[in-house]
Amino acid sequence: MTNYNEKIKKVLDGIIANMSENKEKYVIDPKKNFIRNRKLPFETMIKLILSMKGNTLNKELYDFFGKNPEEIVSSSAFVQQRTKISEQFFIDLFHNFNNSMTDMKTFKGYKIYAVDGSDINIAFDADAPTYIRPQHTKKGELTKGFNQYHLNAIYDVLNRVYVDAKLQPRPQLNERRMFLDMLQDMNLPIKTIFIADRGYPSWNFFANFKHKKNAEYVVRVRDSENLLVKHLPMIELDIDRKTIATCNTKKGKLSGYSYFTKKKIESGDWDFGEEEELNFRIVRFKISDTTYETIMTSLPRDKFSIEDIKKLYAMRWGIETSFRQLKYVIGLTNFHAKKDSFIVQEIFAKLTMYNFCERIISAAVVKQDNNRKYSYQVNYTMGMQICLDFFRSLVKTDNVYSLILKYIEAIKPGRSDVRKLKPKTFVCFTYRVAA
């Protein structure tokens, strides 16, 4: 186990070194940028951006250079060097790191991927494509304008790593289209189940899965909106349904098919021909005395029971937990820039570091005591802090797992709480912890 964290770090360091050798692909001007020896060469800049947490920029530089007055550089020098780096480096680094690792955990031989999105608040800029204009509330009050990116992500819930991600300016939000673009680009060597919530299902969504090798879906649907579901009795059930999606409106009405206008094809909401036969399995189960959940899936009944479907959909919560850790442990809420390209750099840097930390933590084995009431697991918040310090070489290789296992917490299954939604704003540069 001790050598595993060193192996992960060597893999990431090796990828950074190899990509840095071809830095001309990732700089704004290959003829001028990073051609002379400076205090902040290309590879150092990359590791510095990867290692940043949520402090002020000066504090990040102070920590990175070991508090050595001969080594520390000014924030303006850092920004000047950063301007020369394309955000594409960090996007490619995220994918290259994933491609270099083998994440083995499966459920009945299937990879389990959750699909979701999360809004990311950034600094105010009324001229940016991320700007959301003031709107009137139900009370007639005018809100303030603000800026957001939307992170569309695919997350491996068993191996606890981000598999793919795409960014959109929040005003251009289209989660379904972003997911289908990622799905179409993915290579799936083994069977994979994608779990999604109510905002994702559409005829185009289902048709894409029909044509994608090794891709299966488990998706929650709205009882009142889905044509195949809304007339079903409100009881527990497990049935099959079939429809033909067609853009021939007249034929659709006469035959009882699911039809849509040709505008959907023109707008990119339909990726196939005029007709597509679609088959579904519809599962409905109770989640309380008065509430039911309705799931549509492509999984075969002989391999996956209703209990399996219920368990799979519950796994989707893993991506919600990951967003919280990504934002408030890794530091995605605390950016060090206003410029869009710098923000994209930091978002993909944080995704890479999240995966780096999780892959190390996954090898930590917590010894269970039969005399204890609960089973125990690693405290992921502290585990990630230790891994980030290890990346900065502030923690010795041999001490990583002994430190991680100092911080464990009880697993208390069955707990639930009402989700508390609160509006959040960008964390201003002048309101950062400098300790």
Task: Report each predicted region and the residues it spans.
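Single, function-defining residue in the core of a domain
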Residues: 1-55, 63-64, 72, 77-85, ...
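Short Lys/Arg-enriched helix C-cap and helix-to-coil transition segments
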Residues: 89-104
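Conserved beta-strand elements of the Class I
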Residues: 111-113
